[in-house]
Amino acid sequence: MGYPGQAKKLYDTPNHPWQKARIDEETSLVKKYGLRNKKSVWKHASDLRKYRSNARALLGVMSAGNLPEDSHYIRDAQNIVKKLQTLGILKEDAKLEDVLALKVDDIMERRLQTIIYRKGFANSIKQARQFIVHGHISLNGRKITVPGYLVLKSEEDMLSYYVGSPITKEKLMAKPQPASAPKAAAAPKAAAAPAEAAAAPKKEE
């Protein structure tokens, strides 16, 4: 039993602090998906391990055969596949075996921050996070400020800029006009002034 009032950690931290291959992979994911730290990587990696562990156990039981059609093992396998399909992590024709081939990237691609960037609501993955945190993004008309929210497949078309936000796709894609250079335009006149002064007749004393 945990301490009352204290939330339980939802992810497992690495067992060994100094593993170059793992550190390089985590750093690459942080940069690729614009994360603030590695906690999101560890959380999604923990979720993936649970999915794969459950799938592996169910495949072991189901491979033995002789299971009735209403067996809870079959229902559990169907529920895992259906859940991952609903999240858009697995394709519609996927099977339980496909869960074993999933990577952390597959879950990262379903984050709200990633989808906002992929759909062109932001010019960069970091800008997508900024828009979400500052309340410029809505899901089905409601403001959403959680970059790590896993977007359902059915919710992708419900994403938009929040009503009242000054940001639009037109403004985002518009290129700023180059600033005029009045000094450069005045340069020829300034250069011509000494020549005109030299050509002017001198007054007799």
UniProtKB/Swiss-Prot annotation:
UniProt-listed HAMAP family: Ribosomal_uS4_A
Organism placement in taxonomy: Archaea, Methanobacteriati, Methanobacteriota, Stenosarchaea group, Methanomicrobia
GO CC annotations on file: small ribosomal subunit
Pfam families for the chain: S4
Any one GO MF annotation of this record: structural constituent of ribosome
Location of the region described as Disordered in the Swiss-Prot/TrEMBL record: 173-205
PANTHER family: 30S 40S RIBOSOMAL PROTEIN (PTHR11831), 40S RIBOSOMAL PROTEIN S9 (PTHR11831:SF5)
Keywords: Ribonucleoprotein, Ribosomal protein, RNA-binding, rRNA-binding
Function summary: One of the primary rRNA binding proteins, it binds directly to 16S rRNA where it nucleates assembly of the body of the 30S subunit.
Ranges of biased composition (kind: Low complexity): 174-205
Family: Belongs to the universal ribosomal protein uS4 family.
Subunit field text: Part of the 30S ribosomal subunit. Contacts protein S5. The interaction surface between S4 and S5 is involved in control of translational fidelity.
SMART domains: Ribosomal_S4, S4
Gene behind the chain: rps4
Domain of life: Archaea
InterPro entries: Ribosomal_uS4, Ribosomal_uS4_arc, Ribosomal_uS4_CS, Ribosomal_uS4_euk/arc, Ribosomal_uS4_N, S4_RNA-bd, S4_RNA-bd_sf
BP GO terms, sorted: ribosomal small subunit biogenesis; translation
Domain S4 RNA-binding: 110-172
Cross-referenced SUPFAM superfamilies: Alpha-L RNA-binding motif
Gene3D superfamilies: RNA-binding S4 domain
Protein name: Small ribosomal subunit protein uS4
